[in-house]
């Protein structure tokens, strides 16, 4: 299974957050895409204070098996949003994104968040799990290629807020989702909750609240590959917010997820890659 540790981002080992990152420089994949695309690898739902864990079922289901079609549609939100919402914006138009591996990697298949369909080539047999992660039955090797079809959405897009507002306000799955994806450990300090409330004070909708948290992190915290590592007895996100105030992707993603959950916004911690194409339409 994919881990950022294979690419130099878990120097503390065993998925423990923190430490000085040493990113690898070899190419992982080539991506043909018309715009900046976030490619998700793994999602995690439980925050311990020092790491993230995936507590979803370890069972995997054959992607093309009709028996699991309903589960696949639910996991990947294939039937969402409603047709009326789709017609309200072209933001959810499907794009073809072609990926070819340039080096060996774990069995995890990289895809955008809202996967609609997947075409694999050669001996790649895709499976999925209930965390909406995709895998094949072996490790990826150089030359493996596949095409995904999905809308390409970026948080903060001006038209995304309008799309969210057009969506139905009642979701039969919301209570179940919220219970799992707003859970936090009891040791988090009250001052973090107070500061979160200040961040979102002027935000009128859940989407605006998430954007307000994002802007706060972008404005007041610095990106670096050489941050100070929190002491063993301190919460990782709290230390980042109040002491270190600098870090790399795992720092910002952890803080964003925890703060969103504090605000009552269901959120998962996600790891993967950002594909940013050049003028030829390829990202490396």
Region spans (language model):
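Helix-boundary/low-complexity linker signature
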Residues: 1-284
């Amino acid at each position: 299974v994919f881990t950022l540790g294979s690419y130099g981002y878990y120097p503390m080992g065993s998925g423990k957050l923190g430490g000085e990152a040493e990113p690898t420089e070899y190419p992982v994949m080539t991506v043909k895409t018309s715009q900046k695309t976030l490619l998700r690898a793994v999602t995690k739902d439980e925050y311990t204070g020092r790491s993230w864990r995936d507590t979803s079922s370890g069972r995997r289901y054959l992607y093309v098996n009709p028996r699991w079609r309903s589960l696949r549609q639910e996991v990947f939100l294939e039937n969402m949003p409603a047709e009326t919402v789709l017609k309200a914006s072209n933001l959810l138009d499907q794009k073809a994104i072609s990926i070819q591996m340039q080096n060996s990697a774990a069995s995890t298949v990289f895809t955008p968040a809202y996967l609609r369909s997947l075409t694999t080539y050669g001996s790649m047999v895709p499976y999925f799990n209930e965390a909406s992660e995709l895998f094949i039955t072996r490790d990826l090797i150089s030359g493996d290629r596949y095409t995904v079809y999905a809308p390409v959405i970026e948080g903060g897009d001006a038209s995304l807020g309008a799309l969210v507002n057009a969506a139905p306000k009642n979701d039969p799955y919301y209570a179940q989702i919220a219970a799992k994806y707003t859970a936090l450990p009891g040791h988090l300090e009250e001052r973090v909750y107070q500061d979160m409330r200040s961040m979102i004070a002027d935000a009128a909708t859940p989407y605006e609240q998430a954007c307000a948290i994002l802007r706060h992190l972008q404005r007041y915290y610095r990106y670096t590959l050489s941050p100070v590592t929190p002491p063993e007895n301190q919460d990782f996100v709290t230390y980042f917010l109040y002491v270190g105030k600098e870090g790399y992707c795992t720092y910002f993603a952890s803080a964003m997820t925890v703060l969103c959950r504090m605000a009552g916004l269901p959120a998962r911690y996600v790891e993967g890659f950002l594909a940013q194409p050049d003028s030829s339409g390829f990202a490396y």
